């Protein structure tokens, strides 16, 4: 696509001057260059999806425990815990990222995938924790208590009653955590020290450059990968709902 004197290229068009409603010519140059050996797009995409899924799993697990503590228990320091969970909301992103980077350097996790996953999880935790706290408060504890009365232990009550009941909220928290991690740029750049390559990290320099052919192609891959994972989450949710319906229908 060419939209002015300097011109911007797009993933599937060679020319798209204003005010034309449709492109004048189409071209696959952006996609061809993206999947060429120089870009290593497959490797970067795999790393991005892996980091985002790991972040979603870790964040959702911690958020579930935090949500249960905040919604079901009254203890000393409860409000302090709530404040700590929401703290990333209150600190400017740049200040927060610098602080996390220093902490991870001291822990020896800077420049590692584990450090990036941990940093992303800290950012995503407030969103996921709020989702899970509200879900657990709405669900209450009556079904869990009934399961225990029927002889279910703590682990069995969680696996057979609590988690299935909370599956929509769990998938919502996981989806939120996934998209936050998948789209992180600045935090990944700092914590990853340029060693951990993700889709957002590789795409940003092309967005800032004059020729946006590769950036547009990366954008297409970015959207497609996100939709694919969300479709997977939707399939999992539908399967869980179908199992619950079959169970109650006998």
Regions found by a protein language model. Give the residues of each.
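Transmembrane alpha-helices
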Residues: 1-4, 122, 129-133, 140, ...
């Amino acid at each position: 696509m060419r939209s002015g004197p300097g011109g911007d290229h797009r993933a599937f068009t060679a020319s798209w001057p204003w005010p034309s409603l449709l492109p004048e010519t189409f071209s696959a140059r952006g996609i061809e260059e993206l999947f060429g050996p120089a870009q290593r797009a497959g490797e970067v995409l795999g790393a991005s999806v892996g980091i985002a899924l790991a972040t979603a799993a870790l964040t959702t697990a911690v958020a579930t425990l935090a949500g249960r503590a905040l919604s079901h228990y009254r203890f000393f320091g409860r409000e302090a815990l709530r404040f700590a969970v929401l703290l990333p909301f209150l600190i400017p992103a740049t200040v927060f990222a610098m602080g996390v980077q220093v902490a991870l350097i001291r822990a020896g996790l800077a420049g590692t995938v584990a450090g990036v996953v941990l940093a992303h999880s800290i950012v995503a935790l407030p969103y996921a924790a709020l989702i899970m706290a509200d879900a657990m408060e709405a669900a209450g504890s009556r079904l869990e208590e009934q399961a225990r009365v029927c002889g279910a232990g703590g682990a069995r009550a969680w696996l057979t009653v609590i988690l299935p009941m909370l599956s929509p909220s769990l998938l919502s928290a996981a989806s939120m955590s996934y998209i936050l991690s998948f789209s992180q740029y600045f935090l990944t750049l700092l914590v990853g020290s340029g060693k951990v390559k993700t889709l957002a990290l590789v795409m940003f320099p092309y967005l800032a450059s004059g020729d946006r052919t590769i950036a547009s192609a990366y954008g297409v891959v970015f959207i497609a990968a996100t939709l694919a994972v969300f479709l997977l989450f939707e399939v999992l949710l539908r399967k869980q709902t179908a199992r619950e319906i079959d169970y109650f229908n006998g």
